[in-house]
Curated annotation (Swiss-Prot):
It is found in: Host cytoplasm; Host mitochondrion. One of its GO terms (cellular component) is host cell mitochondrion. The keyword Kinase does not apply. Its main location: host cell. Belongs to the rotavirus A NSP6 family. InterPro entries: Rotavirus_NSP6. It comes from Rotavirus A (strain RVA/Human/Indonesia/B37/XXXX/G8P[X]) (RV-A). Interacts with NSP2 and NSP5. The keyword Repressor does not apply. It holds the Pfam family Rota_NS6. Transmembrane segments: none annotated. This is Non-structural protein 6. It comes from the Viruses. The lineage of its organism: Viruses, Riboviria, Orthornavirae, Duplornaviricota, Resentoviricetes.
Length: 92
C-alpha cells in the first residue's frame, strides 16, 4: 500500500472525529466541545511525532484544522466575547 492509500483512512477518521465533535454542539456546552476538539488536536500532534511519515500531518494542516474549528465556533456562537475566549483557548 502506498503512502497516499495509508494516509487516506487516517484523514477520514480525523474528519469523522472532528465532525462528531461539532455536531455535539446542540447537546453540550461550547467549552465541552472545545475540550474535545483540543483532545483531537493533541492526538494529531502525538501522531505527528510517533507515526511514519505517511500518517504525519504537517504544521500547516494542523493550523488549518484549528482555523476551521475557530470559524465553525464563530458561526454558531453569537456571544462574540465567548467566541474570542474560545479561539484563544484553542489556538496556541
Amino acid at each position: 500500500m502506498n503512502r497516499l492509500q495509508q494516509r487516506q483512512p487516517f484523514l477520514e477518521n480525523l474528519l469523522v472525529g472532528v465532525n462528531s465533535t461539532f455536531h455535539q454542539m446542540q447537546k453540550l456546552s461550547i467549552n465541552t466541545c472545545c475540550q474535545n476538539l483540543q483532545k483531537i488536536l493533541d492526538l494529531l500532534i502525538l501522531h505527528r511525532t510517533i507515526h511514519s511519515p505517511a500518517f504525519r500531518l504537517d504544521r500547516m494542516q494542523l493550523r488549518q484544522m484549528q482555523m476551521l474549528a475557530c470559524l465553525w465556533i464563530h458561526q454558531r456562537n453569537h456571544d462574540h466575547l465567548a467566541t474570542l475566549d474560545t479561539i484563544k483557548w484553542i489556538s496556541p
